[in-house]
Amino acid sequence: MSNEENKVTEEELDQIIAEAEKVEEAELNEESVDEQEAKIAQLEAALLSSESKVKEQQDSVLRAKAEVENMRRRSEQEIDKARKFALNKFAEGLLPVIDNLERAMQAADAENEVVKPLFEGVELTHKTFVDTVAKFGLKEINPEGEVFNPEFHQAMSIQESPDHESNTVMFVMQKGYELNGRVVRPAMVMVAK
């Protein structure tokens, strides 16, 4: 072999080696790209997982806030209700006192000069007492002439009456009372048939 042939062969050999190195480098780059793509896919999956966890946590926080708000509102309503109706049993206990004062005024002879000062004292006591309990929300239910309503009235008897429309209250036997819109005692009434 001559030097020229050797040169060509060496040049070819150098070229082959250079091409082999390029191929090897390209394969390394492909492996590196594959590894990077795998890492990117892993990171994207982790990101999606983190985002879904964040959404779940945000939903949990919103639900917790709503629950706390509902509890606060319920508590306020219960406190308001308790405040309004705390006097219910006390009011029930006072009703016989009002009834007895009214009976005393009905039984007394207001024209009798001996009884008149006593009658006026009972009348004044009754008025003061009724005014005082009214300040705390206790109101009288006196439905004479109204249409019978079982929520506010208790029918003690039903009678025919040409002077009254059917199903109206003819006579109140005992006044009823309500406390802040809630019936403490229904009015005992006689209803027209």
UniProtKB/Swiss-Prot annotation:
It comes from the Bacteria. The keyword Chaperone applies. Its main location: cytoplasm. The keyword Cytoplasm applies. GO terms for cellular component: cytosol. InterPro entries: GrpE, GrpE_coiled_coil, GrpE_head. Homodimer. This is Protein GrpE. It comes from Vibrio atlanticus (strain LGP32) (Vibrio splendidus (strain Mel32)).
